[in-house]
Every structure is written in structure tokens, then in C-alpha cells.
Amino acid sequence: MTLLLTFEALDQGKIKLEDPVTVSAYASSMGGSQVFLAENEVQTLETMIKCIAVASGNDASVAVAEYIAGSEEAFVDQMNQKAAELGMVDTHFEDCCGLTDSDGHYTTAMDVAIMSRELTVKYPQVFEYTGIWMEDITHETRQGSSTFTLNSTNKLLKQYQWATGLKTGSTSKAKFCLSATATKDGIDLIAVVMGAPDYKARFKDAQTLLSYGFNVSDLYLDENTDALEDLRIEGGVEDTVPVRYQSEFRYLDTEGNSLDGVKKTIELPEKAQAPVAKGAEAGRAVYLLNGVEIGSVPILYENDVAKAVYKDYLFKIMEFYLL
């Protein structure tokens, strides 16, 4: 969740990767997995992200939380708000790095999967960090300069050829946990393992889950590159308006259906009434499998078309007779 809120703040322009982040005494005191940041040490936000994503640095997590929200407590409030927004009904955070082993700090595999999906789908640039296996950072403190090597805690990156990330975690109460992502043949999967008895078991179980997922999954992809006919406009300054698909269409089947049977139908009116706004929905492309709708893609107006007034009709009449 710390990474999710960090990338969200980056996307909103509240912070930048090159921002300097100063380490507080509290952040530097964090136990567990750490990158040994010193009090008053300054690192860029991007370096802090690497410390969190690669080495699970609890000290870096707290430093970033304090930088974004002013305090870890305020940041944790944001974490719980985001969890509620995402429908993570079985999750409650009490810190930003997972060190707390109290009954009030809890989650489930499903909720972690929801959170991981939100992070990776909205901010795929996270893979630039979670995919790092090893990288050096430089500590600049009053004691001088020193190099520290970040080693990924996600051993699946080397053990499973399709792995792309994402994040490990462990405490004495939670045991060994992992949210793992992988990509194969255009299919992106997330596997979440919690409560594994040892650190090797979580990677083995995640690999088993991911391999199973790929074996039972089949992807239907329509890039929607076919041209759509212009739509007639009534009462507008233009007689027609171009339309376009909003996006490609993807459907993941896990039931063993033949995706050759997918049919696409275009739902558009014969004509539209002016005015119309660019980007507004004109209709949709509907996808059916065995007669059942499996999804749709909005079809949008490509341009604005204003409503015609008297002078517009006059110009059209003059154009007709003069040309």
C-alpha cells in the first residue's frame, strides 16, 4: 500500500522522483528488513522507492510516508482510506511497513491481490523497480560516503522465467508472505501466498499458483484497429462526426471455452442530435461468447459538433447554390 500511495501521489503531481527525502530519527530506528538509512540522511524519492521495492526497507517506507503525509500516522490513515475505496473489507493497517504484529493490523490474500492489481494496472512503471534484482545505492552521511547493495527479497525473479515482481513480507506472526506477478503470452497474473512456513515455501507455492493460472487461462484480444463509419449528425454545424473505440478489448477465459466463438457487434444510433462533445460516448462495441455478453468497449465521438443556428443554415444554402 505504501508503494500504491506513493505512485498515486506521483501521478497527481504532489511529489516528484527527484525530490530529496530526509530521514528522520524515527524512520532510521526501524527494525526488521532495512537499508540502514541514517538520521538526517537525504536520498531522492526514486532511491527510496528502490529501497522499498527491492529490499523491503522498513526505514525507507517510513521516510517516504513521513514525506508524503507529514507523519506515519497520517499516512496510515490514507492507507486505510484507500483500502476502503478499493473494497478491501478485511484489511486494516496500523503502520506503513507491516512490522506491527497486533490484532488490529490484518489483511487477507484476496485483499492483497486487489491492492496489487490496483498498483500494477494503474501504475505499471512499478515493474521498473520491483523487477530489479540487485542495485547499489550510496549513503552520504556525516560519517562519510559508503555503498550499500540492494538485493531483491523476491527470489522468484530468478526462479521463474515469467516473473515480473512484486513484493515480499514476513513477521513472526504473519509468517512468510508474497504477492507475485508474472506475464506470459499477453496474460498478466497475480498470485498471493500468506502464512508460508518458510521463505522458500512462499516462492514454491506462488510458482505453482502462477503456472496453474497460465495453464487454465486463454486470452481473447481485439485491438480494435478497424475503422468505424462516421455517424450522421442532425441539427449540427457538421453533417457527420467521426467516432472511435475507446480502447482495445481483453477477455480472460478460465473455463476452457473456444474463443473462436467470440462475436463483436457495434451498437450505434443511425444518427445523433447536435450538439455532441468530443470524448462523449456515442455507443459501444459488445462482445458475445456463446450468446452471452462478456464485455464491451465504449465508442466515443472524435470531435465536437456544435448545434447549428440560423446563420449556419443560411451558409449551407448559399454553399449549395454557389457550388
Where are these regions (language model features)?
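Domain-terminus/edge residues, biased toward the C-terminal soluble/receptor-binding domains
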Residues: 88-92, 103-106, 110-323
